């Protein structure tokens, strides 16, 4: 795991994906299945989005490979009175039967996974015609190789694609159809400042990691963006 991901875990950063919770809400309001359909939050982090779905009475299940993040998610669910099943596992080895979910949600998780395995597993656990909703980092334009390597090494990305490449990849891994989604500012509700659930002990080096993250995002803002896609099995 990259030091960046360790930092997110120790800081308990909620909504650590493009747009945060406001973005997630707007995407789900447009794309989520009906509330009786089971959803898997694959890489749930602190459980912020899953809790939102739980309060809407979705039968949601979460999985995350990071034990610290998962404990913080479980604590959130308990504090909010939500009975959400939570499993520690990797996307590449999901502990669920085939065709278990109508929807899999991935918020800035696929970019850190071994795509060949993770997309195969997501497809396996999706019901026929089920959907994968992804909010992922994406390049706005081709990035020079040295700078791209710097970003991948710092964040721990296994891939860093342009939006069109994401759609080609998804179709190559067996998804029948993909759609791009865009949001307007009026689609999103105001959300307060980024929420954190800090671990008791945090090495000062992780504060340096956070500062480097801010610097890289500013330095490479002309290249770094995001994409929202829906892929149908």
Swiss-Prot record:
**Is Methyltransferase included in the keywords of this UniProt record?**
yes
* Keyword terms, alphabetized: Methyltransferase, Transferase
- The record's top EC class is transferase
Show the stretches that span the lipid bilayer.
Answer: none
The Gene Ontology biological process annotation of the record reads: methylation
Any one GO MF term held by the record is: methyltransferase activity
What Pfam families does the record tag this protein with? Answer: Methyltransf_11
Q: Read off the SUPFAM superfamilies from this record.
A: S-adenosyl-L-methionine-dependent methyltransferases
The EC number(s) attached to this protein equal: 2.1.1.-
Q: Which domain of life is it from?
A: Bacteria
Q: What family classification does the UniProt entry report for this protein?
A: Belongs to the methyltransferase superfamily.
Instruction: Give the protein name, as stated in the record.
Output: Uncharacterized methyltransferase YodH
UniProt organism field: Bacillus subtilis (strain 168)
**Species classification:** Bacteria, Bacillati, Bacillota, Bacilli, Bacillales
Q: Which gene encodes it?
A: yodH
